Curated annotation (Swiss-Prot):
It is found in: Cell membrane. Keywords: Cell membrane, Disulfide bond, G-protein coupled receptor, Glycoprotein, Lipoprotein, Membrane, Palmitate, Receptor, Transducer, Transmembrane, Transmembrane helix. The lineage of its organism: Eukaryota, Metazoa, Chordata, Craniata, Vertebrata. This is Histamine H2 receptor. Disulfide bonds join 91-173. PROSITE patterns: G_PROTEIN_RECEP_F1_1, G_PROTEIN_RECEP_F1_2. GO terms for biological process: cellular response to histamine; chemical synaptic transmission; digestive tract development; epithelial cell morphogenesis; G protein-coupled receptor signaling pathway, coupled to cyclic nucleotide second messenger; gastric acid secretion; gastrin-induced gastric acid secretion; gland development. It comes from the Eukaryota.
Amino acid sequence: MEPNGTVHSCCLDSMALKVTISVVLTTLILITIAGNVVVCLAVSLNRRLRSLTNCFIVSLAATDLLLGLLVLPFSAIYQLSFTWSFGHVFCNIYTSLDVMLCTASILNLFMISLDRYCAVTDPLRYPVLVTPVRVAISLVFIWVISITLSFLSIHLGWNSRNGTRGGNDTFKCKVQVNEVYGLVDGLVTFYLPLLIMCVTYYRIFKIAREQAKRINHISSWKAATIREHKATVTLAAVMGAFIICWFPYFTAFVYRGLRGDDAINEAVEGIVLWLGYANSALNPILYAALNRDFRTAYQQLFHCKFASHNSHKTSLRLNNSLLPRSQSREGRWQEEKPLKLQVWSGTELTHPQGNPIR
């Protein structure tokens, strides 16, 4: 009886673990899809968000949405069964989509950091530096790199050790990695963007602190300290999430290229892979919900008040415009909120004339 009881207990533990993993992966997929759908809807329904700055956020949301729809369901099935049941041809398509969309997601994050670096370090020349043509070129660059490292490399066998497409085991489906592909993909997709993002966000943080000190004479010391704290927390969340989610995966990826595809345990490989996928679920929160305009759009979206809000805002502007300048200045400051270059970090920029931009 004892051996049978032990086997039964192991089966129950295995089933409980599989159910737990299924719930976690399903929740992650639903959050990824729902969060990025909300970002796309917010931009499509709110004209205020249709700006060049938000082009990269929309591109990021669309990329992560495609990842949640086209890749994550098959990854979850494979993770739970440890068996690929969809054939060799679809395996190549699946792995190519996986690499392409993950690469595009990371490169979009990289472009967002460069965009905000230009906005903070040189706000007066920002409209000259960031033009529709340059944004379009940047988006084309993202997808050219992503397609080259995914569909082109995998279907031509550049990533495999023997130069063939796909592996020999028809019941397994994962990206093969040789030395050159592992190093090139790791550097282009993660390590170089990570280095540049660290530099840009450090510069943004320094400027945010300087601005907080500069407006210290206008507002209380406590308010300036709170603004600086918010900027620190936001930047730490953005970089922390990116590093925690992707660093383990690309470390394992490069290690596989150097040591062989079977150098890492499948369970560990699955954990670091889904940790990277989790970044696509966090992006709508980190890059949209922390932005004041996006938060307002989310509230409007969930309460279905786009029309009433816009009409109310228009009436306020018309009423303020009819008042004398001396009488309407304070009301316009609170209600109208003129066109601004908002930095998502939560720290206020300073207008050339000395007025803070909220």
